[in-house]
Amino acid sequence: MSDISVDEATGTMSADVTVTNTGQVAGKDIVQIYDNPPYTDGGIEKASANLLSYEKTKLLEPGESETLTVTWNRDSLASYDAVNAKAYVLEAGDYKISARSNSHDVIDEKTYTVDVTQTFNTADNTHDGDKVVATNQFDDAKGDVTYLSRAGRFANLAEATAAPTSFEMSEANKAKFLATSNYDAAAADADSSATMPTTGAKNGLVLGDLAGLDYDDPKWDQLLDQLTVKEMNTLISKGGYGSPAISSIGKLRVSDVDGPASLNNNFTGVGSIGLPSAVSVAATFNKELAHSFGDAIGTMAHDMQVSGWYAPATNTHRYAYAGRNFEYFSEDPVLAGSQVAEEIKGAQAKGVYAFLKHFALNDQETNRTHMLATWTNEQAMREIYLRSFEIGVKDGGAHAIMSAFNYIGPEYAGANPALLKNVLRDEWGFRGMVLTDYFAGYGYQNADQITRNGGDLMLATIDMPISTVNVQDAAGVSSLRRASHNILYTVANSWMYENGQPEVTRNAWEYITWVVAAAAILALLGLEVVAIRRYRTRKAEAVITVEPNASIDEAGSETVEE
């Protein structure tokens, strides 16, 4: 392992590592670079082994060598101080940078010294390219939990790992717990300074006119001015496995399909070939392979007329029983995030937007739609649970996110402004749409709350009053407009619009559905005609024949004049 080199202008750090195949057969190997940061007892919590970056060799024949250059950003050495600075901090001291065969076994080690502590807390000194300063957003998610600390050589181990003594939420957290039953849109607007947006304008633009334009291009305002409130509600509410056509602006009905390792259309039953699981892709440590995975998804999406892919998924493997472990990559956020970023880049190079999911802290399937609350602290969130998503957005360039069913502390993840606005959009600079996980209400999902707090599209397959924004004041309509912008921006930059404005068409399954529905209606009408005819025939047969010169008396009996 060479000495560490640093580009002070960009913050890029690197080391050269030579790998030699000393075995008897050809094979590949992985170079993993870790750091062991300086730790002060009782100070910022730090792990002694943190994966910074990795690379994989080519196929090496016996006796063959290859020198790999492994790079990472200096900011990756920083830790998040959620207690005092409430920001990322790169503490002064010696950082042990090592090449390892795994997180435990050191092969070679160098020292990198930071002379002065650096706190990333000003607009001209943000962490890892953040657009704004990263600061505490999730204090309420900490809950009534004792977290394990390294202080005193893990002196609180017994307390932190003891069984809970109470299964009741504190009154303070109960007071903050938000669901549909206690959500008040009017109260949410109390301090709003929003003005009513223009709607229904006749500017003559179609969505294809904006393909490839920046998110903030002035033409977007002109296009959005053309939408009516009804059209915007249609757009955000019918997001089950695609987004609907809006003919007035040339918006196609596009298909988005599920499958972490394939593409599966729930309506047509058509699926692509299956690819290896996320766990297998992560285990290869092969970025090129992950990119090829995304490329294959993109190619098959074209064959299936698909625009969006409900994957990759990148929550953390915390324990063996998590219900979605098969979809998630790793217990390490850098490994997971790096592989995810390559899959996204591969798919999006083919014009297919990948929904990075389930954002965030999705950890179990049991009770997943029963207001399941996940509790953690800010440092763990930023350094572990959000980190792979951050890499997927910043390095992978993700344009779509699927939020999670669970709560983060007392707030639903799919309507959490700290997560979806402050961190995702403001800090990381995400541009695109946020889709809910399956939308069926569950007592806490409603479109009004979701769109006001950073969500955009409801993964709904049936019409429900809660899937539209019903409080149509200035703030409500502004939220609809923002959500519409995010959806339309993502779709306009998909392969469906790569050649400009296409003809507004429908999917084959929609026509099939209409034909089946029409046939059913005609069959019912035919049965109704048959039933009416039979009824009239029976009624005619039941009429009493009255002979000439007969009359009916008041009692209804028949009399005949002699």
Protein language model regions, located:
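Glycoside hydrolase catalytic-domain context in secreted enzymes
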Residues: M1-Y80, Y88-S98, S103, N125-E562
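Short beta-strand elements
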Residues: D105-H127
